């Protein structure tokens, strides 16, 4: 209802796509501006899909999961470039929390940390938000 109201009031057509479990680029449609919120949630979904039994996680599988997530983000970027649009990726920063002891959380932290770094390195701009204050990193 809020989206409909906003579309009518502002003359801007936008919507929220939730529950993206694979092929996020395919969900973009013709939207020129995309906010990909919760890269961390998407990473968790990919981890669960590619390694349902965390005891089977290997360094090789971890790298494969990282490549899959990064490829999905790059596919989204390519689609946005085709539309001459912009994309914002929102994610969690894993380096400021207490080091986990749970094997799944350890793998998640390593994977998301690597993915975040790769995405940030290839982005035009990078911001960090703490206590509601944004800091431009790049």
PLM features: residue spans?
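Conserved P-loop
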Residues: 1-29
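Short, well-ordered secondary-structure micro-motifs
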Residues: 1, 27-28, 46-47, 99-101
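Flexible, charged surface loops at secondary-structure boundaries
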Residues: 26-31, 81-83
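Short, conserved beta-strand edge motifs with alternating hydrophobic and charged residues
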Residues: 17-18, 35-37, 89-90, 129
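A basic- and aromatic-enriched beta-loop-alpha substructure that forms the phosphate/nucleotide-
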Residues: 21, 32-54
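A structural micro-motif
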Residues: 12-14, 32, 85, 124
